[in-house]
């Protein structure tokens, strides 16, 4: 029943909220299933320009300001005419990215079967006895993989808050960490000399989320393609942020394995691979080649560190 039909004074404020020019939805709070949040959005995105004085000068510095050729972070925040100054980035030799081309397509198998395949890769990589970080895009997949692993590990939602898990992982309490959310962009792992990283799925935003749907509508009205002008570039940005979690020092090494075979089989996958390869080595491998590729890179890193140590002693 529509609240405006009730006609009761105590519902007036709530009725005004629901009948105003907003899109709204109900969502459970993250920390408590008993709390319900009333979320709303009039424009589909946060317009920073509306909150600042007209004479305010703003400088934004980030590795991810440019989203695509037609959309930038400045555009989305209400600064369509903001100039972008780009700096050249040197290619990182201490990190390689492996794209697995024969992994089951995530859209062709059940969530359980996909989780089983992910768990099998984790078991194989765990044999190297190096810290292993697995970044998921959903809580459900994370927990499903966790339930399938016999190896000791730390899992978000099971073993504590992200900050606690990070500390335990860096102390060496467990060699496997399963995480999502803030682990993609808000956590740095700088203590380990080498880290293995696994990304089971490409980090696309859920197209059914209210804010995403609203933003897609606005981009279409502006004559832009929501997927190629925003969703795909944002997924690439999130991937770049994730890859940066494990190379925080010049002497730190990392191998990242992207299991989602859409990065190889789909047309847009070429754009992802080309973008990532500008800053690091990207290789396309079959699953049976993964072990030898990781072993070779590990050995090359050890050899480089030995040579560096010898030079420093001279």
Residue ranges and their predicted role:
Residues 1-314:
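ASCE RecA-like P-loop NTPase motor cores
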């Amino acid at each position: 029943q529509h609240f405006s039909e009730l006609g009761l004074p105590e519902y007036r404020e709530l009725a005004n909220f629901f009948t105003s020019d907003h899109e709204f939805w109900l969502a459970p709070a993250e920390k408590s299933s008993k709390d319900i949040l009333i979320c709303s959005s009039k424009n589909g995105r946060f317009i920073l320009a509306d909150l600042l004085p007209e004479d305010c000068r703003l400088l934004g510095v980030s590795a991810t300001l440019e989203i695509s050729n037609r959309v930038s972070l400045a555009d989305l925040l209400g600064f369509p005419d903001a100039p972008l100054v780009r700096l050249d980035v040197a290619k990182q030799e201490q990190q390689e990215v492996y794209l697995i081309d024969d992994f089951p397509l995530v859209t062709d198998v059940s969530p359980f079967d996909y989780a089983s395949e992910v768990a099998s890769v984790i078991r194989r990589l765990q044999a190297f006895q190096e810290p292993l970080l697995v970044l998921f895009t959903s809580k459900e997949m994370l927990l499903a993989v966790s339930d399938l692993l016999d190896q000791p590990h730390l899992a978000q939602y099971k073993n504590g808050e992200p900050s606690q898990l990070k500390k335990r992982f860096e102390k060496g309490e467990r060699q496997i960490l399963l995480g999502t959310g803030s682990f993609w962009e808000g956590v740095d792992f700088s203590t380990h000399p080498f880290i293995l990283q696994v990304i089971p799925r490409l980090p696309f935003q859920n197209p059914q989320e209210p804010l995403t749907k609203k933003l897609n509508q606005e981009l279409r009205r502006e004559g832009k393609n929501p997927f190629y002008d925003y969703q795909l570039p944002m997924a690439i940005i999130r991937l770049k942020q994730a890859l940066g979690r494990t190379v925080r020092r010049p002497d730190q090494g990392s191998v990242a394995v992207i299991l989602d075979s859409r990065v190889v089989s789909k047309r847009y996958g070429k754009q992802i691979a080309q973008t990532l390869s500008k800053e690091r080595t990207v290789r396309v491998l079959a699953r049976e080649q993964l072990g030898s590729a990781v072993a070779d890179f590990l050995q090359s890193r050890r050899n480089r560190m030995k040579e560096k140590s010898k030079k420093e002693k001279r």
